[in-house]
Amino acid sequence: MDLNVELEFIKEPFHIKDMPLKKVYVLDDYLSTTMHHTIDDKITRNAFWGKNNQVNSNSPTGLPHHSFWGAGYFRGHDQTIEHDMEPKKTYLMRWFNRKLQTDFGFMWERFQYFGLNSQTQGLEGTTHADCEPQDDWNLSFLYYPNKFWNDSWGGSLRMYDKMQQGIHGRAEHIKNHQVAEVYFKPNRLLIFDGRIPHGADAPKPAAKYMDRRSLVIRGDEISLKTLWGEDAYD
């Protein structure tokens, strides 16, 4: 695949007409203020968070590449609810998942995961990809639900032309292999090919105890049909 990433800032959703995606799309103010704030309230006032977003390493110390807070809603082809998640707490996120499919004109054929990430200062996200190289028809979404974020707090999403394992050498990897940077901004939605290596910066010390929150929605394969089974581009 071509890793010369091109960013395109769009003003409204569009029906996808061709796969794999050729660009990384950024859509600001995706949800109404009411829905944006409702989602943030729902995820910050629940006790389902755990230190479960971990990328393991082969280090003899047993230490992971990265480990930060997360929560899973549902995963897999049948979108099975995570074992420690109450069904009623998934309703809003199932609405969000349907909205993405309606707004962008597709259906999940091999759904992978819907969950949350939370990073405070020091919890850098190391480089990873969301799916396997052969999954041409994959799709990844990131949505940023924080109500407020100061630009000086950092938290950029970085995309690369090459994978890199672990936190050691990350600064050099950014210098030599970064191909795109997307700033963290409340109510921002990103749509991209999940095979692109990427990772999110931790908030800077100026953020104090503020955390960088994101909704993660991704699948290994989509079809360009609406939820009613019609061709999305007709």
Predicted features, each with a name:
Residues 2-107:
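Non-heme Fe(II)/2-oxoglutarate
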Residues 1-2, 234:
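Non-catalytic N-terminal targeting/anchoring module and adjacent flexible stem/linker
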Residues 90-234:
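Catalytic core of non-heme Fe(II) oxygenases with the double-stranded beta-helix
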